[in-house]
Amino acid sequence: RSQGREQRAELSGEGWLRLGATLGLRAAPTVLVLDLANAETDSADALCRAIEARGLACAALFSRWGGASRQALEQLPALLAPAQPAALVVMQDFVVGAADGREAVSAALTRLNVPVFKAIRLTERSQTQWRLSSDGLPADSVQYRVALPELQGIGQPHVISALGPAQRDAATGLALRRPQALPAEIQRLAS
């Protein structure tokens, strides 16, 4: 997203270099939100809207986990030109770039030299369950949501979405619970 226009792209393969100009990004400091291409996009979009409401440009970048994420971060300045990265918000869990690309991504983040924040999509608990819990995050998720990202300098974890209400799928009859953005938490992270 940039200047109120939808600015998203799925990153995969080699054809996405110099995407910033294609998306109409300006030569200005830009906050980047990195998420998975196969995840819900409402949370990343809501975060970009909140950042833009504060007068900063924002772009949501969606890539596959592993090699595509490593490539995106290694080439981020060229990818987003003419925009200049000002901060990065990572919504991916585990380590960006997977085990094979962890060190390369860590080096790319060091070269970027921008603050890197961790946004958490809580898929096990609703907003109410999360707020009433004694532990915040389920203990078995702290490793991949907080500890592993911290190995790469991705810190200040912040929950920005939680499990939404059950909705019946018309085709299968299954009750599906998708993540739902938490507006107050998104505003906190954006500030």
Residue spans of the language-model regions?
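An N-terminal assembly and electron-transfer interface module characteristic of large anaerobic redox
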Residues: R1-S191
